[in-house]
């Protein structure tokens, strides 16, 4: 078993090359493109976006329309890049940040391949449901035993958890770990919030 390090330390070191890795064919990062495809297909063109574990804010390059972005990330170095893309930033762990955000405060909430780093994903998803006014896109990674054992940051497999009210819910080949070469299947989930008017 590998020695584990904090997610913040790992992602701070990764920040400068993160965009290149996402675009690298060997990483085959399909989950972000798939999320953008789902979102664009549902004709959302403006509003506020909460991007959970936003990294460098790469998502903003893929969405078609006028959006105000806020990103949560544990890595201050990642958030520096997101800020250059116009993101408002929240530098906190996902669990802490979500608990502090007001209900119905963002139109659209994205949480892409980041809940693998959160032990209590069910509570995070409850907060996401509380925060989103219009739609939610979540991707859950099917982390393999080999990946969980060998990745330097502690990770979990939440890919089989029950998700209520999903309009779309399917698996894709999500991405290949740039450090381990392990391919991870990703469950893509699209939820439209019921209007409370």
Predicted regions and their residues:
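A short SAM/SAH-binding and catalytic strip from SAM-dependent methyltransferases
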Residues: 108-120
């Amino acid at each position: 078993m590998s020695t584990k390090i904090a997610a913040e330390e790992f992602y701070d070191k990764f920040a400068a090359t993160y965009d290149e890795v996402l675009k690298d064919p060997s990483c085959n990062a399909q989950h972000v493109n798939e999320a953008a495809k789902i979102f664009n297909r549902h004709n959302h063109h403006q509003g506020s976006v909460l991007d959970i574990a936003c990294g460098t804010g790469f998502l903003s390059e893929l969405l078609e329309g006028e959006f105000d972005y806020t990103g949560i990330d544990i890595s201050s170095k990642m958030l520096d890049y997101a800020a250059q893309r116009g993101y408002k930033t929240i530098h906190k762990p996902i669990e802490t940040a979500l608990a502090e955000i007001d209900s119905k405060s963002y139109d659209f909430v994205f949480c892409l391949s980041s809940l693998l780093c959160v032990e209590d994903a069910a509570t995070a998803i409850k907060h996401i449901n509380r925060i989103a006014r219009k739609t939610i896109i979540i991707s859950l990674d099917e982390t393999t035993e080999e990946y969980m054992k060998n990745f330097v940051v502690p990770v979990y497999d939440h890919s089989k958890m029950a998700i209520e009210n999903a309009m779309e819910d399917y698996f894709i080949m999500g991405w290949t770990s740039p450090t381990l070469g392990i391919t991870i299947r990703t469950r893509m989930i699209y939820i439209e919030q019921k209007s409370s008017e």
